[in-house]
Amino acid sequence: MRVCERVAVFSGAGWAQKGAQYSEARYGKRDMSYLFPCYEKAADMGWGEAEATVAYWRYMGFYCEQDKEEGERRFAALSSPEAILWGKHYRAFAEEFTGNKEKALQIRQDLLAELPEGDRLRAHVYAAMGDALDRGEGKIAEEAACYEKSLEIVPNLYSLKNLATLYFRYPELGKPKELAFEIWEKAWHAGVWSAANFLGYNYQEEEWLDLPKAIEWLEKGMLYCELYS
């Protein structure tokens, strides 16, 4: 945390990371109330990613009181190349959550065409595309491919947990179930705390029965107040 505070003196990234540390319960207590104020300070310092994030959160009412007009004003004010690109990323989420999935997909496809190969934002776009797919429509392989592409760029992204879950639940993907356990654990160490519950619950199954491990992982899930989802 002290490192974040030192970085925050000259970079908004420090403020954003400070908020993330609290939201991820790195210090034994998860407190999401820190997230928006810290990101807002990062945005005020001109950190492009935070500027777009705050615009989206304010528009949707995530981690703060909803104010669509303020969110729109912030979206319109995005000016740096980084902020504009992240703004498009969040615009796609806004379209998706208001029911316009086709427009969200088009925004993401256009954004991928615009972003250079290897850009970190590409990983987030691929992950979002995977999350948006409906497994009920038989798009499991396509969803897994999106997560795999995201992890090629950012190996510790949150999509680790989702990919592991697909590998575990859908044998048609051709992946051994043991691999899912490895990836869930990797996701945990990357800060995806809900992965603990997947490990805890599945270590209770007869095929993988290991009660000490099940208890250990369920306790970790409880520590961070994560639901099994």
Enumerate the language-model features and the residues they cover.
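Alpha-helical tetratricopeptide repeat
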Residues: 1, 85-95, 119-121, 125-128, ...
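Hydrophobic face of amphipathic alpha-helices that form TPR/SEL1-like repeat modules
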Residues: 18-24, 53-60, 88-95, 129-135, ...
